[in-house]
Amino acid sequence: MSYANYRYMKARAKRWRPENLDGIQTSDEHLINLFAKILSKHVPEIGKFDPNKDVESYISKLDQHFTEYPSLFPNEHTKRQYTLNHLEELEQQFAERMFSENGSLTWQELLRQTGKVQGSNKGDRLTKTFEGFRNQLDKVQFIRKLMSKANVDDFHTRLFILWMLPYSLRKLKERNYWKSEISEIYDFLEDKRTASYGKTHKRFQPQNKNLGKESLSKKNNTTNSRNLRKTNVSRIEYSSNKFLNHTRKRYEMVLQAELPDFKCSIPCLIDTGAQANIITEETVRAHKLPTRPWSKSVIYGGVYPNKINRKTIKLNISLNGISIKTEFLVVKKFSHPAAISFTTLYDNNIEISSSKHTLSQMNKVSNIVKEPELPDIYKEFKDITAETNTEKLPKPIKGLEFEVELTQENYRLPIRNYPLPPGKMQAMNDEINQGLKSGIIRESKAINACPVMFVPKKEGTLRMVVDYKPLNKYVKPNIYPLPLIEQLLAKIQGSTIFTKLDLKSAYHLIRVRKGDEHKLAFRCPRGVFEYLVMPYGISTAPAHFQYFINTILGEAKESHVVCYMDDILIHSKSESEHVKHVKDVLQKLKNANLIINQAKCEFHQSQVKFIGYHISEKGFTPCQENIDKVLQWKQPKNRKELRQFLGSVNYLRKFIPKTSQLTHPLNNLLKKDVRWKWTPTQTQAIENIKQCLVSPPVLRHFDFSKKILLETDASDVAVGAVLSQKHDDDKYYPVGYYSAKMSKAQLNYSVSDKEMLAIIKSLKHWRHYLESTIEPFKILTDHRNLIGRITNESEPENKRLARWQLFLQDFNFEINYRPGSANHIADALSRIVDETEPIPKDSEDNSINFVNQISITDDFKNQVVTEYTNDTKLLNLLNNEDKRVEENIQLKDGLLINSKDQILLPNDTQLTRTIIKKYHEEGKLIHPGIELLTNIILRRFTWKGIRKQIQEYVQNCHTCQINKSRNHKPYGPLQPIPPSERPWESLSMDFITALPESSGYNALFVVVDRFSKMAILVPCTKSITAEQTARMFDQRVIAYFGNPKEIIADNDHIFTSQTWKDFAHKYNFVMKFSLPYRPQTDGQTERTNQTVEKLLRCVCSTHPNTWVDHISLVQQSYNNAIHSATQMTPFEIVHRYSPALSPLELPSFSDKTDENSQETIQVFQTVKEHLNTNNIKMKKYFDMKIQEIEEFQPGDLVMVKRTKTGFLHKSNKLAPSFAGPFYVLQKSGPNNYELDLPDSIKHMFSSTFHVSHLEKYRHNSELNYATIDESDIGTILHILEHKNREQVLYLNVKYISNLNPSTIMSGWTTLATALQADKAIVNDYIKNNNLNI
């Protein structure tokens, strides 16, 4: 072998893997003998199983073999498979059938059972034939055995396979076997190599020149493929194409490919003759699979080749339960929706079972991959590479030790240990042993220590880390700044060659200041240890490391180095200059005893991956893995997942125009007062973001020598800008995009202020570029009036404008006007994207008009001009140019437009009402409120009295009235019930329910005397009847205090039953009922219930099931407490003395206990005065929180609140907020009204409502007509009135709602809609009113 040949094979062997022999299919005896000869030198032979011999001795032999080669047989499955392969054909069939019936059989039991059945069978058996050898040891196991031997070098094994096998086979008589059977070696020698290599190694070609037609076809095809490659265009070859792949045995089958990320499955052709994965455009569109452009043109097809210029991102795919991640080229047409190539199966160790039509995945072979070598030019620095250095305790560098400053010394951290499973114990022990061995940790006696936790590595193993969160609370912050990414990238401008260095275990290269080690102690089941080097997880570590590396690099970081933490990028403008720069940096690292991770370093590259970006001479783009992370994101299920998604998007925001606008619907879900509800709006927002990342722009490096252009614009909720620079081709290329959401205060700015805000924010964002420019840069805006405001030297209008003008003095710029139609990019940054339609493919940068609700058609213009003739002032402006110039009004296409780009319209016309209706009811904003609707319309139109007309329209909108809640104070002042003249004349009653069961009771009957405030508490059950309640009231109240005159209670079925009515009639008292859901009516009982519940909690909170035992104590405690309303105790008012409450006091008796005595009368009078005073005070306090009552008159239409009253209330959260409207019949009290409820619900609800539960229904037939959705009209009850509007008859109908069948509604609808709902009633109305239809 020549030296040149050896070097080429050496380079090839570095990239080759043993799995590449998976494609071998052979039946040649010579080849098998060759394999057997090679194998015999490395792996001992294990003969076939003979059931006629001792089974146990063969089991022992196999067991010893498994023990000797553990890497080949890691589990029971591999041992069982090896055992099956060593059975003869008959025994193998029997064993497979036995294993399918009992999958838990071990390989030992498999042999014993087989020996029992087959041991008596006589006859000739197969010996070591070719098929026997293949069953004994397949090609993959052959390679694994070679690789498993310690004395076989990884590299030389690959070299042996690639070189010796073809070379030996060449000597065989059978010349074509190695070409047709060993496909991977053939591909390497014939198809993969360069043309120059083919000329040099002619001895690898078959010696017989008289090949058959088939061989000649193969040779020609290979040549065609090689010639095609010279044109830099790849070719995908399929069986239906002109160019076929004859180098391997081809097999096809169709499987369902599951795409879990997109919740779909597609039929997929598994084709071993294909060299690339493909998918059709139709499939991509149907399942909305994300794609991206592909710069490498690919030809596929036969006689008429086609080009491919797009491919999908890497997709997660499941085939027969095997998960793989791969990408597809997108083609226009193919025989199947998608196809998986042999290469993909190959790379994922997937084999095809042609008999079972299934796929199976083999275990991957672990290979030792050598780290990239240090270039020869830097060999002098080999001693600072990780290859020559093991981790050890670094020497301290004076002034750069890691200091742990604490806010307080006397602190205690929580101590809690967690049991660890065996897997984590092993990972912990490995980390501890390694740390102790290298000296970076030591045992500690610290009294405070943080716990450890485990995080998964990329390869699936666990890494032990210390959770320093408890300690970080006491650590003083380090204010040393981390570099801004944008400023780092700006320093790279002009560089053409790059080298990236990565420090090995970067944090562990810094020593901890002596005396601070105990502060970094950590605890684990093995004990307490402390770090001698800077650990990960401490809050001040990132800032200190940045200070450390900046100090080490010194002045170099100002000229040819940028570094972010342990990532160091060296950049230069020429090759010779770059060598000096790299040596300078390596020397500085060497002087500081720092070690580089050679495997992650890249030397002398034209483009590199650095801090998440691909950086080159032209500019920088985001890394594909960061883009794929966003593209593959599923729909967030909660706020946490949404924040994670927005975090990934925010990292890429400089590449996404209109970021703030695109994320606006998503950010709204993160507000505290917004309930989580995912809608199609949010889904479309995510899709729009993903579309922007399918083909992200290349941002150029900022160059201070080039001309600068800043384009700005503002929309309703955000500002946007794009910074560009002019290059040698006289074109402007973007340096960066910027967008920002406005604050609540900024949303109220005028249009001019918002446009100026866009300029101010953009200048602040790019201040490091724009503040120090020598030549003035250009600012382009689409707001003409803004130029005058900035260049005007007159006194500013307000303090905000004065601050802005002062800020602008720091910049050297000139501002120019460009119409919005030409300001595509900046306008798009700030405008609202239509969230109901996908973004057109060819309009990524087109501006989107945010007030596109009304098209300015010729018909609209003609209608406006016609309206002008009816308005004297506008007609004067239309005909007088001087007047227009004086008032700064322009005439465009016959329309009058003011300085704010608003179209002037006559006031209060049919045209203005149409505009209001379109924006309010037909626009993309759902029934906006008065302020929002006004702001939207004012963007494009204006007329005199516009605000008043919009207010009147919105207030009379039927949909808004019944669905939107009111935020005003409640109606109606408090109307206290006057006190009675004496105790136990006026009572109130209620039940306390939901109590735990105690002695068979689970409720409490509460009776309160409204005069003395005395309470009677009687345990009962929730299921108590009216008869039982009456008996209880008779025995516990009337028997002691006599008959009351009146009782106030709620509308409980007990008190409204006939039994209770008879009971009231018997004892001659009147029942008064509080209003439903109006607790203020019977506030006394509500307050008493709260007090009783508090007392019960105090005495039995620890044993709640004993509350019945404490009722007498609670009642005594309540009745002997001084009441705030009477200034006396209830007991004293009723009984005229105070009982002894403890053994240390005596009861106090009055001299006169007669009820009619003068003293008693005086006490009652005092109590009554106190009650009246309390009522006045209570009314004053309550009335401070209400607004003036709105008086309703009989015949007025009102709506009833659903949510608070329970009236017609359903659990459906999308039900209207109000029911109605209903007619007012009469006023039934100071604040109560009786309504005309439909007969269908009168029996269900009280027809009397407090004014606080009512809202006036505003109805203006001039404004609102056809207010009903025709699908909501069920049965029409009757027709109230009619109107003719624009030659259309509208009917005001009262009807039963289809959406809420228990609701009676009314509203305007067209005659046609009414006829569809109920033809008979409509015809009767037309006939009775003599309407001419």
Curated annotation (Swiss-Prot):
PROSITE patterns in UniProt: ASP_PROTEASE (PS00141), INTEGRASE (PS50994), RT_POL (PS50878)
Keyword Magnesium attributed: yes
An example Gene Ontology biological process: DNA integration
Entry superkingdom: Eukaryota
Alphabetical keyword list: Aspartyl protease, DNA integration, DNA recombination, DNA-binding, DNA-directed DNA polymerase, Endonuclease, Hydrolase, Magnesium, Metal-binding, Multifunctional enzyme, Nuclease, Nucleotidyltransferase, Protease, RNA-binding, RNA-directed DNA polymerase, Transferase, Transposable element
PTM note: Processing of the polyproteins proceeds by an ordered pathway, called maturation. It involves the initial cleavage of a 27 kDa capsid protein (CA) from the N-terminus of the polyprotein, followed by the cleavage of a 56 kDa integrase (IN) from the C-terminus. This leaves a 72 kDa protease-reverse transcriptase fusion protein (PR-RT), which does not seem to be processed further.
Keyword Transferase part of the UniProt annotation: yes
Region (Disordered): 199-231
GO cellular component terms attached to this protein's record: nucleus
Domain Reverse transcriptase: 436-615
UniProt feature, compositional bias: Polar residues: 218-231
Coiled-coil annotated spans: none
Any matching Pfam family: rve
Active site: D271 (for protease activity)
Chain residues that bind Mg(2+) 2: D990, D1050
Gene3D superfamilies to which the protein is assigned, alphabetical: 1.10.340.70, 3.10.20.370, 3.30.70.270, Acid Proteases (2.40.70.10), HIV Type 1 Reverse Transcriptase, subunit A, domain 1 (3.10.10.10), Ribonuclease H-like superfamily/Ribonuclease H (3.30.420.10)
Binding residues for Mg(2+) 1: D502, D566, D567
Domain Integrase catalytic: 979-1138
One GO MF term attached to the UniProt entry: DNA binding
Residue stretches making up the Peptidase A2 domain: 266-342
Note: Retrotransposons are mobile genetic entities that are able to replicate via an RNA intermediate and a reverse transcription step. In contrast to retroviruses, retrotransposons are non-infectious, lack an envelope and remain intracellular. Tf2 retrotransposons belong to the gypsy-like elements (metaviridae).
PANTHER family, A to Z: PROTEIN CBG26694 (PTHR37984), PROTEIN NYNRIN-LIKE (PTHR37984:SF5)
Descriptive protein name: Transposon Tf2-3 polyprotein
Organism for this UniProt entry: Schizosaccharomyces pombe (strain 972 / ATCC 24843) (Fission yeast)
Annotated gene: Tf2-3
